[in-house]
C-alpha cells in the first residue's frame, strides 16, 4: 500500500461512481494534485449493486444536458483508460398509458429538440415492434430514445479512477476518512487511520455516508437512503429471437403508468420499480461497517407493481425469479443531486444524492471540476445546487419529502402541482387570515405562499394539468381587481439581505453591476459572476439613519435563491476584506429571512389606500409623513413611514407593472398592518391576489424572473438587463464591479441571442402539425417553459416561461432567440412555439402589452 501524502490540493472522499468522476474531471481541468480516499473498495456502497441504466431524458433540460454529456463520455473514457465501461446503447421506449403521460412525453420530445436529442414520438404499434411482449391495449403512445441503455457500474467507476491515476491523481482504497477539520488558516485536515492530509479543498462524495461526512463539519445534508429493489428472471426462451434481432441486449422500456422499468439481462429480463410502499434505510446514520452488502428482499412491497407488470408484460407472469436485488440509494428531497460549495465553509464541496449516478455522474463531475477550478460550473446547475435548500431542511423534513419523491419517481409532475409532504412548515403571521380567505397554497424555500384565492364555498384545490386549470377564471378576476382598483399580495417570501457598516456601500458597489442609489432611493441591480453572466437580479434600497446618517442597504431578490445569494455575498465579503477592502466590522451582512414580513398593494387605487393609513411623521424619521403624492413619493423612492401605529419601510415599486407599494415590517406587526390595509382598502374594493395573478401581470409587461429568464447562463445584454449595468460611476470614472470587463465586452460585441416576449394563438385552435398526428394537446393550453421556438422551419431558441396575460387577453411566452430573429426589422409573426407537441403560431412583441410607456407605474 502506497504511503499517504501529507498534503494535496484537493481530497475527494468516496470511491463510488460520483467520487471517481469528480477526481477524473479535476485532472482533466489541470488539478492533478488530487487524492481520492475510499473507505473500502471502489464502488462499495450503492454503485456496485446499481442496475446500470442510463438515459438522457429528464424533466429539467439542464440536467438532461448533463446526462447527455455523461452518456457521450463513455466511449472516450474507455479509450483513455483502457477499461471497458460495458456500454450497451440499446435504445429505450418510454410508454404512456393515458393522455397526461402522453403530454409529458410530447413535452420531453419537444424540449429535446434544442438540446440536439434524437428522440421520436411513436405509436403503440411501433412500440410493440421494439418490445414484442407488451400488450398494446394498455398504452396510448410512446417516445423512442435511441441513446438509452445500460452500462457496467463497476467498469465505469474503475475507468474514471484509472484515467485519473494515469493523469497523476492518487486513489487510496481501504482508507477511512473519519474526521475532517478546518484549520485556523482555512485549510482542511482530512484525518484517516493512516495519517492526516492537509488540503485546500475537499469534496464530500460520501454517498451513503455523505451525511456522516457533512456532520464532521457541522452541517446536516438533506439526503436520505431508500431501499430500492429490482429483480432478475431466469432465462426466458421466448425472448431469444428478440435478443438475437437486437444484438443480444434487447431494448429497454419504462412504463410510467405501471411505475416499472425493464430490460434484458443474461437471457432473461430485469424488472425494477419505485414502489409506493417505500422504505427508508438507516434513517439516523449509516453504519461504517456497511459495505458491499444487500438488504433483505421484500416481494410483498413489490406485489402491486408486479401485478401491473404481469398485465402490461404478460411474459413476466410465467418467468421464474432468479434473484431479487435490494440495496440502498441516496435521494435528496426533490430527487436531484446535491452539489456545489458549502455556504460559509470555503474549500468544502459536496457532490452527493446522485441517485442516477450512471446517467448523471459524468455531468456532475464535469460541473464540479469547472466550478472548483474556474469558479463557475459551466452549466446551469441551479436545480442541483446545494444552496437551493435552507436550514429548514431538517432530517424529518428530508425524510417526508424523500419518501414522497421516491414513490413518485415515475409519476407525472404537473407544472401547477404542489406536493403536500412536510407542509405546511414555515408560515407567516397572516397565514390563518389568508387561509380563511380560501387561499390555494404553494411552498417556496420552505415558506407557504398563496398562489390564488378560491371562490367562497369551493374547495381551495387546483386541478393538476398541463392545460388551463380551474384557477384560470379566478386568477382573471384577481388581475382585473388589481388593474382597475387595488389588490394586496404578501411578499414575505422575497429574499431580504441587509448590509450595514462603513464599508457596506463600497462592497455593494463591487458586487452589484448598477450604481448604488442615494439614501431614500431604490435601483434595479443585476449581479454578475466573473464571466459577466447573471447570478442575481435585485432591487437595492438605501436608507439613511435620520440622526447620524449611517446607511442601511436592503437588497431584495428571489426567495428561492436566498441561500444561493447568501453564499455568494459571504464569499465576496471575505474576498473584499482579504484584498484590503476593509477590516472585520466594516461590513455587517445579515439575511433577514422571515424576520421582515412584507405586504404589497398595487393598482390605480393603491395610493388612495396608502394615504388613508399613512400617519404624520416627525422630521426625525426621514419620511414624508402622510404625503404620498407623486411629487413627495416618486417611483423607486423608499422611506420609513408610520402606517397607523405600525412603523414600516415603504418602497414605491411593484412587480405588477402598475402603481404600487411594498411595505416591510417586523414579523410581529404583519397581522396589524394586514388588517389596517384591508380595512382602508374596503371602499376601493381591495382584493387579495396571489402569485398566479402576479405572474400573469408580469407577462403584460414582459418582466423576466429569476430561475426562468434570468439564470447563470445568460448575460445582461441577452436578457434585457443591460440598461441596469453601469460601467461608469456618476463622475464618469470606470467602476470595478465583478464581471465588469466581461459585461463591457459583451455590450460592445452585441448579444448573440436576446430575450423576447411572444403572444400565441388562443390555445384552443391547434394547427394540427404535431409529430404524432394528433391535435388534442393544443386545446386550452399555454407555454410552461422549455418549449422549442421555431423560426423559418428550424428550432432557433427556447421558451423560458409562459402563461396567460389576463388583462391583455393573450397567451404569452418569454424566451431566447438569435439576435437576428429578435431584431425589430425581422417580421414579428414568423415564429412558432411547440406546446405539448403542437407548433402554434407566435408573434414577437417588441413593446409591453400593458402600459408600454410606464405611465401607470411611474405616475
Residue spans of the language-model regions?
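Glycine-rich FAD pyrophosphate-binding loop
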Residues: 27-48
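Acidic, proline/glycine-enriched N-terminal capping motif
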Residues: 388-528, 533
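Flavin-dependent oxidoreductases
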Residues: 21, 179-295, 304-312, 396-418, ...
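Beta1/beta-strand and adjacent pyrophosphate-binding region of the FAD-binding site
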Residues: 4-18, 35
